[in-house]
Amino acid sequence: MALRWGICSAGKISHDFTVALRTLPAEQHQVVAVAARELAHAQEFAQKHSIPRAYGSYEELAEDPEIDVVYVGTIHPHHLRVGLLFMNAKKNVLCEKPLAMNLKEVQQMISAARRSDVFLMEAVWTRFFPASLEISRLLSQNAVGQVKLVRADFGAALLGVPRAVQKHLGGGALLDIGIYCIQFVLMVFNGEKPEQIQASGVCLDTGVDEAMVVTLKFSGHRLAVCTCTVAAELPNEALIVGTEGTIKVPAHMWCPTSLLVNGVETQFPVPDPHLPLNFINSTGMRYEAEEVRRCVLAGLKESSRMSHADSALLADIMDEARRQVGVVYSQDSQ
């Protein structure tokens, strides 16, 4: 049975997600509608991707009875409102990361999903890459002994990109790209809550974080260090150090296509796109789409690999890191 997708927002990430879906069998995934705030944008997107229906409002997409799941690709300050719209209309939802602006909003999203009895997942696509599944497999077999230290960094030169630096657009390094480093640590430590969170950072004149370093202390003398910046390109690697070896994730750690396990490299290539992409390795979004289909067909309301609890913990940690650095969004006081 084909999962029928609706695409919410006709922006860059929605383009890449739609291209990624096309790398999967048509009898399993079909994009049947797209909605944008301007009909012309939706129509242009629909034409480019051969999508049968285009809507000039998200409400029309929510009312379309022939949609199984909606992919939400709007900027993150809109995730809560748009997510609630679709879930209240009994639509399953795959929502871009961060799921919402803070823990309070994330909890509202989760409550709405439970109330409407629909599937909801934060689109932390990294977790579903074959390389990430291999990391989890290796760790479950104690391939590097007891993990003592995890390091992850993600930096990109995004100071000229409004959505990365403007507060009302949800800008800031942590929510946009630092989230990948934090989620990586939580993946390694199986969703365990850290005992201590220490964050330091520097802020732009707009009031959002230009760069942040977050240190997480876990039980059993385990540490993690996450570094993110929107001011410059970093090595964008991740490292897991155990008592008996190391796993290195070379660039690009948020969409990994290779692993170095004790110095031995294994490649995990992603498929080629049929249209040009906006972001690197975006066809790897196919893996999260496969997980959504698996869960929806099985009647599951969340994925065990990126659960509601995982999203809540991620938001909780980022809230505390922002509090320490002094990054406050309007959503924090609502």
From Swiss-Prot:
This is Trans-1,2-dihydrobenzene-1,2-diol dehydrogenase. Homodimer. It comes from the Eukaryota. The keyword NADP applies. It comes from Danio rerio (Zebrafish). The record marks Y71, H79, K97 as: May play an important role in coenzyme binding. Its EC number is 1.3.1.20, 1.1.1.179. Keywords: NADP, Oxidoreductase. The gene is dhdh. It catalyses: (1R,2R)-1,2-dihydrobenzene-1,2-diol + NADP(+) = catechol + NADPH + H(+); D-xylose + NADP(+) = D-xylono-1,5-lactone + NADPH + H(+). InterPro entries: Gfo/Idh/MocA-like_OxRdtase_N (IPR000683), Gfo/Idh/MocA_domain (IPR050984), GFO_IDH_MocA-like_dom (IPR055170), NAD(P)-bd_dom_sf (IPR036291). The record marks D176 as: May play an important role for the adaptation of the alcohol substrate into the binding site. It is an enzyme of class 1 (oxidoreductase).
